[in-house]
């Protein structure tokens, strides 16, 4: 009996994988996903990941060289982009104290000298999961809009967009992007659209929704017109910031993360619709990215109810808010899965 138990323990010890210490490789991490993709015959149809992310801060030294202002470029080289860096405002909680091993592990993942590291890493997870095409977004830079120094946001967004186009999009046709717009500076926003709209792999432009700018401000109208003329969509990419005054009432990260991603896009969508942007720019496609889906029917009902009681407050609208919302596009991550056990589905 004791011998059998010891043998079982020895086998368990041999099979144990220490993910924190072993050499990290995306292909190993996603081995099961690759097998599932084969079984499910993903190669038989087109799959597009419309909200994929990379960690642009790992290439921050390269991005910094694209900053026009020499003083700010020197500052970026010196400070970097980590906590306390050029734009950061707080700590990181999403890796759950290191228990999500991909965050620290991917930094040490070995890749060939070419193509660019980000292209290799993107390709590995795309191939493993059966994804044909991916729309790449930054990750830490989603909170660049919270930077109190507007010139820093402008400089870094231009540098990042130039680096992304030169190093990534020009080199791999499977990777696309909606480029970052420095929304705190309307003129710079327009300039970026003019500069990058025709670059290879650019399929639209993106606003990070943690900003505190009114999207109905007339200063942005020429940017919206430029996008509509080119048939390029405008995305509002959700994020969170614990510095938001309402979210500061949350004492746990789970509350900030659950509410923040939906709340910011609920606010901007309300302003977008009630100020008649869908009527002013009827051919401009809008996307609401990574804020989930559960809030959409709630917003439809709520805005329609208000609209029917005070239609005069939305003089530009010719239809109910929900009608405009049905013509918009949405992405969700994660899939907002709930308990599907029999007791909940019967």
Residue positions per predicted region:
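Helix-coil boundary/capping segments in enzymes
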Residues: 1-346
